[in-house]
Amino acid sequence: KVRRSGLTMPVVTPRFVDNAWRRGCDFVVLDLEDSVPRNLKDHARTLIKDAIPNVSKGGTEAFTRINHELMEADTAAVVWPGLKRIKYPKTETADEVRALDALITRYEKERGMELGSIEIDTGIETALAITNVYDIASASPRVKELSATNGGYDMSRDLGVEMFVPYDQFVYLKGEAELAARALGLAVRTAPFVANTTGSVSDADRALRQAKAARACGIYLGGGGLNPAVVDSHNKGYTPSTDDVRDAHWVLAQFERLQTTDEPWTEVEGRFIDRYEAERARGVL
């Protein structure tokens, strides 16, 4: 699945939802959590079912983010055909993931949906979540990817640190989460540090630099942006360049020639070619 770019938007704002599929992003997160005021939570739940096919036009995937403390009510409202993923924020234990899995399964059965069709995305946003991250990531087969925290407001508040600073105060946390994901064979969504001292969510240049840096680190999944201005940057940054694609085809061609010999590796034009380099090239393509 190609998931380079996304937009998170309040489901209670019709103009955002109606235009989401035109933004060019690979997925849209219909938000019930932070962007929806407490007094509109009940109303927001009534909008999800119709919003799913609306944002899915043109092949965009529909995700939703529910409220941690309102798991049962929110899950009942969002499990409908066409939804691809539920983002569960502030996940802290494996038991929470298993409880969410059971709820999703219940409604998939009741509504005649394919069992297991909806993924779970766990929000690793607290110190406790980091200590439990391996158990969280392995708690359900619905967890296909792990969002290795980039910090954010919740993690900053939990740790008591400043968020918009010129250094990476979350490097250890991201590393712990990424190692757990790699050990489990899960795809990883995170990014190397690129300073954002102003808190801007619409800096297209910074978004491009961060996406390119992430791809160079073997991270091919983009995040859910908050402003349409960063969508194109994420699409470009997470997409291999023409030169990258050409090089990958060349590497595979050399590897195919190597397969006709008894040698485990070869050197062509100063490049070392073996099965590991071939695997890297396949990943690019």
Protein language model regions, located:
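Expand to "…catalyze enediolate/carbanion chemistry for C-C bond making/breaking, isomerization
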Residues: 1-285
